Amino acid sequence: MSDVANKWGKKVAERGFAQIPNYLLLINQFLDEEHTLSPAELLILVQLSSSWWKKDEMPFPSMSTLAARCGISSRQVQRSINNLENIGLIGRVKRRENGIVSSNAYNMEPLVNVLALIANQFPNEFPRNVSKETIKKISSSLSAETAKKPRRKLVMPRTQATKEA
């Protein structure tokens, strides 16, 4: 029996597990006050990460799915998604299926880039005290990413692209 099954039980282990980077779980200690995530925003990033199965396919849970999984209202999900997009941690991509508007897809690459920056700054440890200088550097990378990115002009991977009606 695997360690996962030993720890959680066979029936739970058979249903699968999500891979969530530790740096994502600890992200707030690396961000300044302006960029600190609310509990809802962090939970949404965890849920998006758990729905992101393949690198070249963006996750696309609906607002109502995210609301149910997070135990918050759809409006709270919308506000959280807007803020995550505005600070440059995710990108939102509109989708259509057979000409009908479908749930948004979410580009996780900006989050990957921020977590890589954090990992480069702290390759061998999980610090308890992060210097203000490091926090400023990481947070300013968010501001730089936000300034560079075009609003909602992200390209869907070919495997997820849908035909416009």
Feature roles, as predicted:
Residues 1-76:
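Short recognition helix of helix-turn-helix/winged-helix DNA-binding domains
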Residues 2-15, 86, 110-165:
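Charged low-complexity intrinsically disordered patches
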Residues 9, 17, 49, 56, ...:
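Small/flexible residues
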Residues 36, 50, 65, 100, ...:
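Residue-identity detector for threonine
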Residues 55-57, 62, 90, 108, ...:
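Generic alpha-helical propensity signal that fires on short helical segments
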Residues 64, 72, 105, 133, ...:
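Serine/proline-rich low-complexity intrinsically disordered segments, especially terminal tails, linkers
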Residues 73-123:
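Winged-helix/helix-turn-helix nucleic-acid-interaction surface
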